[in-house]
Design a protein with these regions (language model features):
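Solvent-exposed soluble domains appended to multi-pass membrane proteins
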Residues: 1-157
Length: 157
């Protein structure tokens, strides 16, 4: 594809859906690790160099691309650019919501909260009130946006 006309004007995003549940690696064979995936941004001009260990998720792809392109107009997204330092991820599995931040992992089942410092959820830590507030507001914003069909801007291009 390097010989295609569009190649030099394309940003490629390579990622995965989730890890295999049959993984033998202890870092991935757990409730958090199974959602750990690589995310690679590539451009032919090599402007996207380096490696980052920030916590990201699929909802960060669009804001990241808009950031790289220098897009400044308003847009709707639950994610953030991976090129910012504010890193977090949220996922839901059955009744369990999980917020992953640099401070740890916050589990939420039926409004009961527990926090852990490790991906295998063995080392409990004190709940971070800021993380609880963030997770509650995210869930509320997401639910209301879905219920009232507000997952769009009223802004016209």
């Amino acid at each position: 594809i390097k010989n295609e006309k569009w190649f030099n004007n394309t940003i490629f995003v390579i990622t995965a859906d989730h890890t295999s549940p049959k993984s033998v690696d202890k870092n991935y064979k757990n409730k958090i690790g199974r959602y750990s995936i690589p995310m690679l941004f590539y451009s032919a001009d090599n402007t996207l160099k380096g490696q980052s260990n920030v916590i990201t998720q699929h909802i960060d792809i669009m804001p990241s691309l808009l950031d790289v392109l220098g897009y400044k107009k308003p847009y709707f997204s639950f994610g953030e650019s991976v090129f910012y330092k504010n890193s977090w991820a949220i996922h839901k599995n059955n009744k369990r919501y999980c917020l992953i931040t640099e401070k740890g992992i916050l589990n939420n089942i039926d409004e009961n909260y527990s926090s852990f410092s490790d991906w295998r959820l063995k080392n409990r830590i004190e709940n971070d009130k800021g993380n609880i507030k963030f997770l509650k507001s995210f869930k509320q914003h997401y639910s209301k946006s879905m219920i009232y069909n507000h997952i769009k801007l009223k802004y016209e291009l």
